[in-house]
Amino acid sequence: MPLISLVGSQRPDSFNASAVTLIERALKSLGAASERAEWANLALPLYSQVIELEQGLPKAAGDLRSRIKAADGLIIGCPEYNGFMPPLLLNALTWATRNPRGHPDLSPLDSSPALFARAVLVA
């Protein structure tokens, strides 16, 4: 299974998306395949135990969870917003680490190597 990449920004000219693209190209030159998890295709609700208890794990969350679990690794482009991880990325990782029974389950991240990248602008 190819590597899965996530970028914590939806901005079209995101520096972090550019950084992840460079990483993906470098890995491709070494023979590693990767695929980007696009936010437009995820459609995840804001994490809530109320939603989880009443409606179960959203299909998009289960799909992301399965993709991460099956992947050979994870590439995360993580911008910093006011010193924190972006809510979009945190929400996706929160849903991806919940099991169908509504419990925390970090197993999708257990056996996969992960690379965290961040673009930093120095003024």
For the regions a protein language model found, what residue spans apply to each?
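Cofactor-binding loop segments of dinucleotide-utilizing enzymes, especially the Rossmann-like FAD-
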Residues: 8-9, 39, 123
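N-terminal beta1-alpha1 ligand-phosphate binding loop
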Residues: 1-32
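N-terminal glycine-rich anion-binding loops that anchor highly charged ligand groups
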Residues: 33-38
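N-terminal beta-loop-helix "entrance" segment that forms/cooperates
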Residues: 39-57
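Short, glycine/charged-enriched secondary-structure capping and boundary segments
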Residues: 18-21, 49-52, 89-93
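Helix-loop-strand module that forms the ligand-binding subsite of alpha/beta enzymes
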Residues: 56-123
